[in-house]
Design a protein with these regions (language model features):
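Short, flexible catalytic-loop segment of classical short-chain dehydrogenase/reductase
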Residues: 166, 204-216
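Residue(s) in the substrate-gating loop at a strand-loop-helix junction
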Residues: 162
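Catalytic Tyr-X3-Lys loop
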Residues: 102-140, 158, 182, 237
């Protein structure tokens, strides 16, 4: 087992992508702390891990709450301290997104068609919440668990960036800018923590299959939405990503034997989406 006796903290562990990562780390022998807001989802992941004899702890927690993360840190330190941190918590908010893709002067006078929403109509509290969960939800856990990694002589952090880090998608203003920040933060923190032998990298998933994506993209098997057709047409590999497409990259970045000289990078896992200019 590659990660036997290692302790991993996985935030967003109740989601489709990070649950798969957590399960794979447990299969490799790591003790995994499952962090997220919804205890029911975390328990399902826990049950899967326990079904094959893996070791996991369910810990509902808000990653943007510094005090709550400090309490979590104490619990992790009691069993040996964190070796790996996966900052997978994050997301978007429909209230932070317009429904139109280009400025329309009518949005300034409230005269858009019924149901249409421009940039000036978005909910700023929702906008801030997206920045908070994606940026501070990465900064706070990293600073907490890096302290434990220092004591252990090193460790590895993997952040969740996005293809939006490089090229923003339409309507995703808050999400795109926050994910661009994650790529920059990954570089900044990698340089800062390098003297402590803490490596910090990021993965940038492309369009991945989960329950949320099925609603607005559809599926290749059951039929695509218009936006789904655009995505597949722009993805050289001709499909959406699956959660298990991420696990190999994650395990490589965590593995000290294979990536000990790798830090500060963001790895696209997107089926080639970013290789095309769109024309």
């Amino acid at each position: 087992m590659k990660f036997k006796d290692k302790i991993a903290v996985v935030t967003g562990a109740g989601g489709t992508l990070c649950s798969e990562i957590a399960i794979n780390l447990a299969k490799e022998g790591a003790k995994v702390f499952l962090i997220g807001r919804t205890e029911e989802k975390l328990k399902k992941v826990y049950d899967t891990i326990r079904s094959f004899g893996g070791d996991a702890v369910v810990y509902p927690c808000d990653v943007t709450d510094k005090d709550a993360i400090a309490v979590l840190g104490n619990e992790v330190e009691k069993v040996g301290g964190c070796d790996f941190l996966i900052n997978g918590a994050g997301g978007n908010n429909a209230k932070a997104m317009p429904t139109i893709t280009k400025f329309d002067p009518r949005e300034l006078s409230g005269e858009l068609e019924e149901g249409a929403k421009g940039l000036y109509d978005i909910d700023m509290d929702a906008f801030r919440s997206v920045l908070d969960i994606n940026i501070m939800g990465t900064v706070i856990p990293t600073m907490e668990f890096a302290k434990q990694m220092v004591k252990k002589g090193g460790g590895s952090v993997i952040n969740f960036a996005s293809m939006n880090s490089y090229c923003p998608l339409t309507r995703c203003f808050a999400y795109a800018m926050s994910k661009a920040a994650i790529s920059n933060l990954t570089q900044s923190f990698a340089a800062y923590y390098a003297p402590a032998n803490i490596r910090i990298n990021a993965i940038a998933p492309g369009f991945m299959v989960n329950e949320r994506s099925k609603a607005y993209l559809g599926t290749v098997e059951e039929g695509l939405t218009k936006r789904g057709e655009q995505v597949i047409g722009h993805t050289p590999m001709g499909r959406f990503g699956q959660a298990n497409d991420l696990t190999g990259c994650v395990k490589w970045l965590l593995d000290e034997q294979n990536s000990s000289f790798v830090t500060g990078i963001t790895v696209p896992v997107d089926g080639g989406f970013l290789t095309l200019g769109g024309v």
